[in-house]
């Protein structure tokens, strides 16, 4: 079988070229052309402009034989994780050939990929590299050969262009929206007739554009306490603080402004908003990735253990005088600590005498970072809230903050009574 993985939102002439190349390979081998079509959320973590059903029709009209829906990934995981999962699915389905478009010469793509494979790096491919995602697909396909003892053969065609300009699905969608949901003539030239017809039908039926559930999204952003927001995947402490400061939200673009203040780019902002909308927790992400790890699908530099190990290494090196960036770079080059990362440790509290009588051992301690950047917890005995900064050594405070800012490692706090007083037992993973 010949495979293509795509959004096709909508199918344009560049996509038609992809499908025709796949058709050419398939006809020589007597095989089918399968489109692994993203459903629910796009590969860039946004709601689709065109429905899955309409995009499926477009792909079939363009020459595909079958559509395989890919659902449940793109509102949860970054591309670094969705790519190995999708490639593994295709290999397991029996796909032997993969077709993609690239502006860079295929020999250069293979050369770039070989370097990352040799170093075992699949998530840190520089953004400056052209066709970065194609390089990632090729490298991960080679990595998964170790797991499946087979891999897909890649076929590259040039990226689709009209009059020397690359065809952009984003630009097509923008121009249709800005033209009051009428397809302008310059956009029609970029689309096959079948896509134009299906788009017009979908617009007439009121199915375009797709959108977020803003009622759910804004209510959660406006009302959830800080510790609950911090438990949502892909929100770090800075993002949560700026979200809290930016309340009350009435439109999505207001949330984007808050996320920009936390140095979130467009892709991470879309992913974070999708996680808030769908109430995706850190634990859900952690367990999902761990499940794929057990299947041998996740590259070693992306495992949850490696994320935790990196946090411990950086905290240890910062404690010895290195900067955070220096420690991260040394870790990337293979340096490690001799001791293992702690998955459980205790923190002290600052409690007032009148708060002590309401505390009970085993109570949940909800972690958060206050507006001054101080690590803290909130206890909820009956009828009151008890808030306290956490007492930690510098090394352990750095470790905890890095885990919080990992955006995916779940953290749990429990109140314990010890001889020296009350403590919070922190557990991760």
Residue ranges: model-predicted function:
Residues 1-52:
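N-terminal catalytic cores of NTP/NDP-binding nucleotidyl/phosphoryl-transfer enzymes
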Residues 62, 66-374:
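Active-site cores that bind ATP or allylic diphosphates and position pyrophosphate for catalysis
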């Amino acid at each position: 079988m010949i495979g293509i993985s795509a959004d096709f939102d909508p199918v344009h002439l560049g996509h038609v070229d992809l499908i025709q190349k796949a058709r050419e390979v398939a006809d020589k081998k007597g095989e089918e052309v399968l489109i692994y079509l993203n459903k629910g959320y796009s590969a860039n973590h946004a709601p689709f402009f065109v429905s899955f059903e309409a995009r499926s029709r477009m792909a079939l009209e363009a020459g595909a034989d079958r559509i395989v829906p890919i659902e449940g990934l793109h509102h949860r995981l970054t591309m670094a994780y969705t790519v190995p999962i999708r490639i593994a699915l295709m290999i397991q389905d029996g796909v032997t050939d993969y077709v993609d478009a690239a502006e860079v010469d295929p020999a250069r793509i293979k050369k770039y990929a070989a370097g990352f494979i040799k170093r075992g790096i699949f998530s840190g491919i520089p953004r400056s590299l052209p066709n970065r995602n194609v390089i990632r697909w090729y490298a991960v396909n080679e990595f998964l050969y170790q797991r499946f003892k087979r891999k897909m053969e890649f076929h590259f065609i040039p990226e689709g262009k009209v009059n020397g300009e690359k065809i952009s699905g984003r630009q097509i969608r923008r121009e249709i929206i800005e033209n009051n949901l009428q397809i302008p003539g310059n956009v029609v030239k970029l689309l096959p007739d079948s896509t134009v017809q299906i788009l017009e039908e979908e617009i007439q039926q009121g199915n375009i554009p797709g959108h977020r559930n803003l009622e759910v999204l804004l209510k959660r952003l406006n009302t959830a306490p800080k510790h609950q927001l911090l438990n949502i995947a892909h929100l770090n402490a800075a993002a949560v603080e700026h979200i809290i400061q930016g309340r009350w939200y009435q439109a999505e673009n207001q949330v984007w402004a808050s996320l920009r203040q936390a140095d979130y780019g467009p892709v991470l902002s879309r992913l974070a908003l999708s996680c808030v909308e769908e109430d995706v927790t850190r634990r859900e992400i952690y367990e999902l990735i761990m499940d794929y790890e057990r299947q041998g699908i996740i590259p070693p530099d992306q495992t949850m253990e490696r994320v935790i190990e990196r946090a411990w290494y950086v905290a240890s090196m910062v404690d010895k005088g290195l900067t955070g960036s220096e420690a991260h770079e040394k870790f990337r080059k293979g340096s490690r600590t001799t001791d293992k990362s702690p998955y459980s440790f205790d923190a002290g509290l600052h409690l007032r005498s009148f708060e002590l009588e309401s505390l009970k051992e085993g109570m949940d301690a909800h972690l958060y970072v206050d507006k001054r950047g101080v690590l803290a917890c909130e206890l909820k005995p009956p009828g009151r809230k008890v808030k306290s900064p956490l007492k930690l050594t510098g090394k352990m405070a750095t470790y905890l903050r890095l885990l919080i800012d990992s955006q995916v490692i779940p953290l749990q706090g429990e109140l314990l009574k010890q001889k020296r007083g009350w403590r919070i037992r922190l557990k991760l993973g």
